[in-house]
């Protein structure tokens, strides 16, 4: 399996039915071992942060063992809209 920001973005978008996904490879030489993600999904509605992160972790269960560092931000569509206005 070859990890890339594009691969992770598409998997998160499909599996979490996300309306917006940003994935940044934060590895020094872009060698795909560290990522920062932002996922906006209605599936996060009514769920606390820990449950949201679990959904993301479950989605990427096969990929996470190959990732050295993983930072995630999970928002509902309403939170995303509000945050962009600020």
Swiss-Prot record:
Subcellular location: Cytoplasm; Nucleus
InterPro entries reported in the protein's UniProt record: BOL2 (IPR045115), BolA (IPR002634), BolA-like_sf (IPR036065)
GO molecular function: 2 iron, 2 sulfur cluster binding
Residue ranges crossing the lipid bilayer per the database entry: none
N-acetylmethionine carried by residues: 1
Pfam families in alphabetical order: BolA (PF01722)
Quaternary data: Interacts with GLRX3; forms a heterotrimeric complex composed by two BOLA2 molecules and one GLRX3 molecule; linked by [2Fe-2S] clusters.
The protein's name: BolA-like protein 2
Name of the gene encoding the protein in the UniProt record: Bola2
């Amino acid at each position: 399996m070859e990890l890339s920001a594009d691969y992770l973005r598409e998997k998160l978008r499909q599996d979490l039915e996300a309306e917006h996904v940003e994935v940044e490879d934060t590895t020094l030489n872009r060698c795909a071992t560290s990522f920062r993600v932002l996922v906006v999904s209605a599936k996060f509605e009514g769920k606390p942060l820990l449950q949201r992160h679990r959904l993301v972790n479950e989605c990427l269960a096969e990929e996470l063992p190959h990732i050295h560092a993983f930072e995630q931000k999970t928002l509902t569509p309403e939170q995303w809209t509000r945050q962009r206005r600020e």
